[in-house]
């Protein structure tokens, strides 16, 4: 379960009912990346985000009930609330700490104590876990695209460090998300994720584990 939390903490939200994969998802590097899943490798075609957050289409703004499913049936369905709001520049961004805490508590319950944003960097969050553990997650690569007015794709690579008793454990997690607006109050999505070894073992790496998820978002406000 902790590994699933590592995958989910970097997300603004999880995934939904599938539609056709492949180049039809949109032109460019993200479509090519999707075509190659699950045989992903690093380095990925993801520019460094600096200190800018991932910006979403305006139709994401608000609070949403999420129903997240594992199409393989390995993990139980998750139900939680996420929210997106305007930042100081007027762009719609995910409330990362709120959303990560919602996902984490749905997975781990009381084992997740708190999630905090780094006030100096919107791409860095710190989660406090039971057992004197702390998970630090920093987005180090990102690319997004809108093939049309109702579709949005985003790919993020996060560096994750789990601090606790013993030596820190370092890994990299990549999440490619594809969202489609079904109407003003519904969004469906699909996500593809892969985890990689620590950069200390080499910047180039093949995916060690892969996962795909589906989700449906229904507007609350």
Describe every region a protein language model picked out:
Residues 85-161:
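Predominantly extracellular/secreted and cell-surface proteins with exposed
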Residues 3-14:
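Bacterial N-terminal signal peptides
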Residues 1-3, 17, 28-29, 99, ...:
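Serine/threonine-rich low-complexity intrinsically disordered regions
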Residues 1, 69, 184:
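Residue-level marker of positions within ordered structural domains that often coincide
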């Amino acid at each position: 379960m902790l590994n699933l939390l590592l995958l989910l903490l970097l997300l603004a939200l999880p995934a939904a009912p599938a539609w056709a994969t492949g180049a039809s998802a949109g032109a460019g590097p993200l479509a090519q990346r999707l075509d190659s899943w699950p045989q992903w490798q690093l380095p990925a075609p993801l520019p460094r985000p600096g200190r800018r957050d991932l910006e979403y289409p305006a139709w994401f703004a608000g609070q949403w009930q999420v129903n997240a499913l594992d199409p393989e049936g390995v993990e139980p369905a998750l139900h939680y609330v996420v929210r997106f709001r305007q930042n100081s520049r007027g762009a719609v961004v995910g409330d990362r700490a709120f959303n990560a805490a919602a996902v984490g508590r749905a997975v781990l319950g009381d084992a997740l104590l708190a999630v905090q944003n780094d006030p100096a960097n919107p791409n860095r969050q710190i989660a406090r876990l039971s057992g004197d553990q702390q998970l630090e997650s920093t987005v180090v690569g990102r690319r997004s695209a809108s093939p049309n007015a109702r579709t949005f794709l985003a790919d993020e690579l996060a560096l994750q460090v789990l601090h606790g008793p013993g030596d820190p454990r370092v890994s990299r997690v990549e999440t490619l998300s594809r969202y489609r607006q079904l109407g003003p109050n519904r969004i469906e999505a699909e996500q593809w994720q892969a985890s990689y070894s620590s950069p200390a073992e080499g910047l180039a790496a093949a995916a060690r584990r892969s996962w795909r998820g589906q989700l449906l978002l229904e507007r609350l406000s």
